[in-house]
Amino acid sequence: MTVEFSGAVTECVRQMLSDQKYNLILEGTFRTLETPWRITEELKFKGYTAELHAIAVPKDISYVGTLDRYFVGKTKGTGRAVDKRHHDLVAEKLPVHLKALAKSGMFRSMHLHTREREIFSTEHDVEAFMEQFQREVERRLDFAQGNRLAKRIDFVDQALAEEERRGLAAIAETPIAEIRRELQAIKKSRNIGMER
């Protein structure tokens, strides 16, 4: 019910603001190709020019980020949990959908960002855009980034322990035991807690 309601409200606000020719920034996960494609075509029909911006984050860091955001938000009453299967589906589909959108010719320019800054932009070079995207999502972490990730994982571990003390066994349908296994796998693959 909440998803349908928020989607309807978002659609209504977008229509109203685009009819009034406001500058718009629309965000989404690119879980499907249909939604960003449809919205871009609608806005171009109304006379808008469009830019494609994507944030490239390694999958493991992204997943830890969803947990971190959930637990931080929960303390403020705004926590929104993400099922790991949904996260992994989005991570799997993102490169495919991003490339299709980039190749569509609908965008004046394409921009690639990390969570910190823009790292690449182009008007037409889809292959270079996608190569840079792949490099970023597959990158190794430097020492400081590894330490930040370790702190986030420790925070999530503590929050999971608190949830277990309260009798919860899952976060957004993902069993806490599965989340813990994933966090351990991330620590191992990133050499966190080991000599770096």
Language-model-derived ranges and their functions:
Residues R190-R196:
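Short acidic DE-rich linear segments
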Residues R31, K44-L67:
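Conserved phosphate-donor/acceptor-positioning beta-strand/loop module used by diverse small-molecule
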Residues L33-E34, D60, E118-F120:
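Flexible loop/turn segments at secondary-structure boundaries
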Residues Q20-K21, V57, R69, G73:
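Generic recognition of well-structured, leucine-rich alpha-helical segments
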Residues M1-E42:
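Conserved nucleotide-sensing/catalytic segment adjacent to the nucleotide-binding pocket
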Residues V64-K187:
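Conserved GTP-binding G-domain of TRAFAC-class P-loop NTPases and closely related GTPase folds
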Residues K21, G47-T49, M106-S109:
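A generic structural signal for alpha->beta connector loops
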